[in-house]
């Protein structure tokens, strides 16, 4: 019997945690591969999980065995049928900067009912076992260990076993088969309960992410549970939950939005909860103070040095973020564990924990995108995390000398940090210029000067949560204030698809003794467009689209093939810089998923590439691939070049690089046309994938990787190194590309499995 219940709860947890990345991955193509998809999914699943706990509590307390046997099992069967009926999400009816409501609707249709029922399984199975009359039924908490093991299996099996080997349709079929098996196991579990059992004082109602150790090893004394205590529980659960989503979004926005970068933070979060409830939580809280301060210092440096992240190794970025999440999660969950009530109040305790977790999802997934122009929720939760440190009660210190020292730390350090930031902000630039070092070294020294003293102060204040919180808030607030008041930032906005900003920069042209100003469009940490502001230079294409770069050379080759005019279909608008290459006889249609990007590119107060275009230019809003499919189905006129340049910050929307996508591009091409793909990426090597996709479609494959060494040093601010690949089925077009002198025939550096709409594996594309 024990093994039966262990397997049942193990199966339920495995299903619970494997369905989340599976459904989220199926939604990525519908919403442009945005990293916000997973944040919204977590919000939805945390909320449904809370509803599942409420349902389980109601069933165990109010529903008879007979009704459970037929009513609950009947609902499970309905959920299984619903899982088969709603198997594919639908795209939003129109482009939107905030499609969260539509995404939540799709989540509810595709997986809402099955997830709701499986989320109630943990407490229900434990409750059923408590009513079996087994010798261990008085203490069913050992089943939490099986639940936690199943959670890890479900989480880690998906990116390492399931995703690399199974397509989405196969994944869904296997999951629904597992759900069907769980229904049978649940039916048997209810049959094993004693007849007439309705309510048992030993039956727990907790969450899946609950203690795997001895729950009675150290609950807090049975103090009255007032609203202050409930608010503490909520806060202790809120901080790790918000940190989980912040770290996940931070990673997936600049690498790629894919399951491994979703489940690793979630696995760390789960592990911190298991350890916190299994260990001596009071001792754990004390031992975590210094590590937590050190981790937060590292995260603060990352926040303040956002540009440094662009050049940091991916492993270092992931390691620092996961370490921070682990320490903060362990602290928050240890605080929860040390304050947990006696067993008679566990139902309320776990319910409030789940409310705190859901609030973290609401804050990161809904509130922050609506009220913040940047990812302010990340530094905010950093400050909240410091508040988890024990607050020193200065009033209870009897020694006058120690009391004065405590006040000096709490008040003096924040004030000193504030004064230091003001002084350095005023004189640091003059100091590094006086040192006479290179521009790169100036940036490093300047950052070190500004961050050094506040970092030391944060560490000195580690023993007082209030002091540490105030000291941490100073450099973060100063950085945010400088960013908000920077006169060179002309636009800042946040949409479902990322953070956008329009920034002015300049350099001095020594040859003509003139100040040259240029404007950049930033998407996260990635530059998505550059334009000179000097009137005589606004028509010059810059950035990745410089006339002497790979994109410029490919367009020049097409002009020679199509002297009477060419039609361009371009997925990804940016600032519209490619328009500067066009002749009056050409025409361009852009496909852009983010309406805010279109607003920026079309508004001449920001960029004038579109408003000053010499040829007809149009912008269609929506996912580029879906719009191309609609054009194909409607039989619209084809293009001479389909250019794919759609980034989500520095990540690639996977659905634009599948074999079905390549076929679609060819369907929209005229004879002799070119598919041009921009594959520059800091972390992913997409060349082998694109080469194999091209060969699979009987294409000539060409590639040009322009290194930084090929660009004049004085032009690096507005001419960027980039990697482009070109596919064509025409030998004449291929020869024209090769004759341009830059593109070379592509070759496969190693073999990778081709991506399809049902299968993709980002792990295979990481830089080797």
Predicted regions mapped to residue ranges:
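Low-complexity, Gly/Ser/Thr/Pro-rich intrinsically disordered linker/tail segments
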Residues: 743-747
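Alpha-helical transmembrane segments of multi-pass membrane proteins
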Residues: 1-742, 757-768
